[in-house]
Swiss-Prot record:
UniProt key word Secreted: yes
Functional note: V region of the variable domain of immunoglobulin light chains that participates in the antigen recognition. Immunoglobulins, also known as antibodies, are membrane-bound or secreted glycoproteins produced by B lymphocytes. In the recognition phase of humoral immunity, the membrane-bound immunoglobulins serve as receptors which, upon binding of a specific antigen, trigger the clonal expansion and differentiation of B lymphocytes into immunoglobulins-secreting plasma cells.
Chain segments carrying region Complementarity-determining-3: 113-119
Main location: secreted
Organism: Homo sapiens
InterPro entries registered for this protein in UniProt: Ig-like_dom, Ig-like_dom_sf, Ig-like_fold, Ig_sub, Ig_V-set, IgV_Light_Chain
Pfam families in UniProt: V-set
Name of the gene: IGKV3D-7
Domain Ig-like as annotated: residue spans: 24-119
Stretch list, region Complementarity-determining-2: 74-80
Subcellular location field: Secreted; Cell membrane
This protein's name: Immunoglobulin kappa variable 3D-7
Residue ranges of the region described as Framework-3: 81-112
Assigned keywords, A-Z: Adaptive immunity, Cell membrane, Disulfide bond, Immunity, Immunoglobulin, Immunoglobulin domain, Membrane, Secreted, Signal
Subunit comment: Immunoglobulins are composed of two identical heavy chains and two identical light chains; disulfide-linked.
Amino acid sequence: MEPWKPQHSFFFLLLLWLPDTTGEIVMTQSPATLSLSPGERATLSCRASQSVSSSYLSWYQQKPGQAPRLLIYGASTRATGIPARFSGSGSGTDFTLTISSLQPEDFAVYYCQQDYNLP
């Protein structure tokens, strides 16, 4: 077996570093699932791998067989026709979507999206 050499370690670290040079922003949502009942409060979190301007952060709702529906844009502004129970907040890397009192029609999949830096 070839003896360990320092340049091997450097090469490994370089490979780990390269993905960050693309400037790609990764959005991570949590929790993956929520088990709640009508009337309860839902809090969904979205974390960016680097700072995102609030102006470019949106939340979408999607139901089976339907296109995504814009809920929130600019991190906190409700889209037209979206009920007041939906609210968005946050800045920098941490954003939150809150549904103050869940209604039966709110049970769906929710996504956050940033348009600040697209791949």
